[in-house]
Regions:
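C-terminal "post-core" interaction segments
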Residues: 103-111, 133-321
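Flexible, low-complexity junctional segments that flank or bridge functional domains
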Residues: 1-187, 194
Length: 321
């Protein structure tokens, strides 16, 4: 993977919109407030090119070893005008991009134009998002946290495989396990959806502690996974599945069960651009045929839940307490 220098970043132009793949459909999730009526719209074409072809071309520009991670990475390129110029979809970075869209709950396609602007001007824009209310169990800036939800349900969110100076991981683990021992919840939900990895060993005492407490108390365990579950977090999900009586709930992971890793970097001598590369191939599951780790229970986020502030995966886990 090759990075970009500050000079190159300063020259990038983008359109004020953000797309996301929702169950295979490319959807407008962020737009200028003055254009908020297109939020939730499905994008059919860009400059007359079907989205399937756009994504197929853009997929060659990102490092990936499964479809889930590819879509997550490509989404970050779809508002950058140079992506379309490189793919031959746009002639230059100054002309408007034309998107054919079908509005949410609409029926007929229509054309919407977006004017490219310099990257540094983005902070001056008034942007609107389809997501206006985050659920209590949504993504947090904390590395890890725990809270009780519903009745007799403990929610443990683990967002990075590293320790936090404000509360070292061993302290957090001890507090969670002590709470379980004393309060005896009926269900534990472990959330790994936003964890991009780190040191997988840090969470193993929690996994082993959950296994022992589950044997003694008989509570159920659901492990939430998704497109943001990657690397060491994926290993922790596999460990939870193997060492405890648990279910994987959510969507296919961004990381693959068997994948390249142990990243190193080099600086290209002429451009000064930093490039990263993998040095090892890790086999986490010898029975896997490759690709994402699949959930036992599929719970795909939908636009209605996002707008209402409902956590689709947590709701699915709570259906069977």
């Amino acid at each position: 993977m090759v990075g970009m220098s500050p000079r190159i970043l300063a020259e990038i132009k983008a359109i004020p919109v953000q797309l996301q793949s929702m169950d295979g459909v490319w959807t407008i999730m962020v737009a200028e407030a003055s254009n908020a009526d297109i939020l939730g719209a499905t994008v059919l074409t860009v400059n007359g090119i079907p989205m399937e072809e756009v994504v197929a071309g853009a997929s060659k520009l990102v490092s990936h070893d499964n479809e889930t991670w590819m879509r997550l990475q490509v989404a970050q390129l779809l508002n950058i005008v140079d992506t379309y110029v490189y793919l031959g979809i746009a002639e230059n970075g100054d002309e408007d991009l034309r998107m054919t869209v079908v509005r949410h709950h609409g029926e007929l396609p229509e054309e919407v134009r977006f004017t490219p602007i310099p990257r540094e001007e983005f902070h001056e824009l008034d942007m609107a998002s389809w997501v206006s209310t985050l659920p209590p169990t949504g993504q947090s800036s904390d590395l890890y946290r725990a809270l009780t939800i519903a009745d007799d349900v403990l929610f443990v969110q683990y967002n990075a495989c590293r320790s936090w100076d404000a509360m070292p991981i061993e302290v957090f683990t001890a507090r969670v396990l002590d709470f379980i021992k004393e309060q005896r919840p009926k269900k534990i939900i472990v959330d790994l959806r936003y964890n991009g990895g780190g040191d997988s060993r840090l969470f193993e005492p929690m996994i082993d502690g959950l296994r022992e407490q589950q044997r003694q108390q008989g509570f159920s365990i659901d492990v939430l996974i998704g497109e943001g579950t990657f690397s060491s977090a994926l290993l922790n999900a596999i460990q939870l599945k193997r060492r405890t009586d648990s279910r994987l709930v959510g969507t296919p992971t961004g990381g693959s069960a068997n994948h390249f890793g142990e990243v190193k970097y080099l600086v290209l001598p002429n451009s000064g651009i930093r490039a990263t590369y993998s040095t090892k191939f890790f086999t986490m599951d010898g029975t896997s045929k490759g690709g994402s780790l699949e959930p036992d229970i599929i719970a795909k986020t939908n636009l209605e839940d996002l707008a209402a502030g409902i956590d689709t995966q947590v709701a699915a886990a709570l259906l069977d307490k």
